Amino acid sequence: MRSAFAPLSLMFRSAPLALALAVAGLSGSALAAPKADIQALAQKHQQPLLDTLRDLVHIESGSKDMEGVEQIANYVAGKLREQGGKVEILQPTDVYRLGDTPEKIGPMVHAEFKGKGSSRIMLIAHMDTVYLRGMLKDQPFRIDGERAYGLGIADDKQGVALILHTVAMLRQLGFDNYGTLTVLMNSDEEISSPGARSTITRMGAEQDAVFSFEGGGTDGGVRLATSGIGAAYLKVEGKASHAGAKPEDGVNALYELSHQLLQMKDLSKPETGLKLNWTVAKAGTNRNVIPAEATAQADARALRVADFTALEQAMQAKVGHKLLDASKVQLKFEVRRPPLEANEASRSLAKQAQTIYSDELGLKMSVMEKATGGGTDAAFAALKAKGAVIEGFGLSGYGAHSNDAEYVQLNTIVPRLYLATRMIMDLSK
């Protein structure tokens, strides 16, 4: 069987799209019942995975909680070392500072497993949560029926646990036909990954396939596209003066800000998914003082990476056309998270995942090509990627970022372990 897949590895290195199409075709011609050894092992890992989830949930790891993110990074690194990986804890060095980026950013865990093949595969998830220290008491780990509840359990500690146990399953199966299996987990995803984004992009560019383990939603689907998130900050400097006695001596920053906002009101392009909406504005200190400063913030969304670049260029051109020559206008544009764009390589691998789910497990899996909701780190992995990038390999669940209802569905543990293991094995041949 390995000889039949040997040319596939060569194709994967030179032409990821051709490889993805070939893999999809091969999977369609080899439909079978579940692989008994993989299924049995996945079932054996259900309780250990829940034990891992309990440990992860009980580590409070908010993005800005350095003690917590360092603790969870050490825990994850230890688990990966147990599986024989070359593991390092990386401190971010190339930081993309956003308006709300904290001074100190948490670490990444990077592990590499070398095999005897040639395919390069990467698994990603994030260890941080949106929650503050002390909130664990309100959402401790617990199991109620077919659901496991806990702080950050769906977003994204289930993804961390799935990767750890997928790696363990591969080792127990004695499988190492890949070239390299890379694991990368960061602890700043919930604050737009300012420290990890460059590393994710660099490593993503080296891979033949990247699987991201954010949750599979309520229906267990995988995602090929996510929306990009941007932000614009406009600052106008004028000159204060008495609004009643000498208004002509001032430079009204509010007038200039209003002019700027109005001339940018038509930059949205709904037909392509580009949206720009000004949402916050502030000016002045007192009713009787001409405002010397005015600021505004905008939310931007895009479905294509190039649209953010074009939008920023258009906005910068607009601010040069001022109402008041004496005013100073500054515009800062942030790409908080780029969009993930579907391509043929990701479509083909997603089809393969669907085939495994339907023909081997008797389960349905949706593939979402239209971006919905927030962005994820999969988009950073895809920025310079040559191969497929697929989001949503995690457990089904609900309630991310909620106060008391975050959970994952227990009946998705075995299928997701099976799927991740099968996909890695198929792509490694």
Regions found by a protein language model. Name each.
Residues 33-151, 169-173, 177:
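Acidic/His- and Gly-rich active-site-bordering loop/insert found
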Residues 25-29:
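N-terminal signal peptide c-region/cleavage motif recognized by signal peptidases
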Residues 43-47, 63-71, 154-157, 161, ...:
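Soluble non-cytosolic domains of exported or imported proteins
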Residues 127-129, 184-191, 215-217, 240, ...:
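Acidic, glycine-rich active-site loops and adjacent beta-strand->loop/helix elements
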Residues 33-37, 79, 84, 215-216, ...:
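Metal-dependent amide/peptide-bond hydrolase catalytic core
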Residues 1-18:
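Bacterial N-terminal signal peptides that target proteins for export
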Residues 104-106, 206, 227-229, 291-293:
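Short, solvent-exposed loop/turn segments at the edges of secondary structure
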Residues 152, 156-229, 269, 428-429:
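Acidic/histidine-rich catalytic neighborhood of metal-dependent amide-processing enzymes
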